[in-house]
């Protein structure tokens, strides 16, 4: 199972942004130079419902490790809390969480440390391993998405023009997310069990389309 270092080539030459991060990335670089590395492994699965049954791997789950940022954790917590306030907030929460994580990843890249953003997809058994991470404090963010078809009828052209209807719903991705904060010591390995019973957040990402012609 390969671990992908998420870094775009053009970012490798980007000018670092002073004061953009609330975490000292030099601590991780120094640990790496001293050879103080760790591994984070685990499984993402649906827990068995009967004692004699087997756990079911969550195929295509993605796991990301990032240097721990208090600002990012606080933002994710805020979005989770806000999702309980209204239906629109709930519908947007998963997307906003992804954007918050991607913004933080970009800051890490632009600070000259693209190798500190690690990502991998689970294997057929739902297992993953993130190896050779500098010892220190990390955020592990895992997600699993499953598309649910909830196709609504196509709009009639006259209705769409008269009422300015929104894009038509095709379905949504039921998204589960796990947030784990871990502190690692040199030469150690850590195992995480991520399953449907200890999900940190459950949300949706809607899939909509703007009808090009009259409904039939």
PLM feature segments, named:
Residues 4-14:
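Bacterial N-terminal signal peptides
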Residues 17-216:
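Long luminal/extracellular ectodomains of secretory-pathway precursor proteins
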């Amino acid at each position: 199972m390969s671990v992908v270092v998420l870094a775009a080539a053009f970012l490798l030459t980007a000018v670092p942004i002073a004061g953009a991060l609330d975490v000292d990335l030099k601590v991780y670089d120094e640990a790496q130079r001293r050879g103080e590395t760790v591994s984070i492994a685990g499984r993402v699965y649906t827990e068995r419902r009967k004692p004699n049954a087997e756990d079911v791997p969550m195929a295509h789950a993605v796991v990301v490790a990032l240097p721990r940022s208090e600002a990012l954790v606080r933002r994710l917590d805020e979005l989770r809390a806000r999702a309980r306030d209204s239906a629109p907030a709930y519908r947007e929460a998963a997307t906003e969480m992804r954007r918050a994580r991607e913004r933080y990843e970009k800051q890490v890249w632009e600070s000259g440390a693209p190798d500190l953003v690690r990502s991998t997809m689970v294997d057929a058994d739902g297992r993953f391993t993130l190896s050779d991470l500098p010892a220190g404090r990390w955020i592990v963010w895992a997600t699993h998405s499953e598309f649910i078809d909830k196709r609504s009828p196509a709009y009639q052209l006259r209705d769409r023009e008269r009422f300015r209807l929104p894009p038509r719903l095709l379905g949504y991705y039921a998204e589960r997310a796990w947030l784990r904060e871990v502190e690692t010591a040199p030469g150690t390995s850590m195992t995480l069990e991520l399953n449907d019973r200890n999900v940190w957040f459950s949300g949706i990402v809607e899939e909509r389309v703007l009808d090009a012609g009259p409904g039939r």
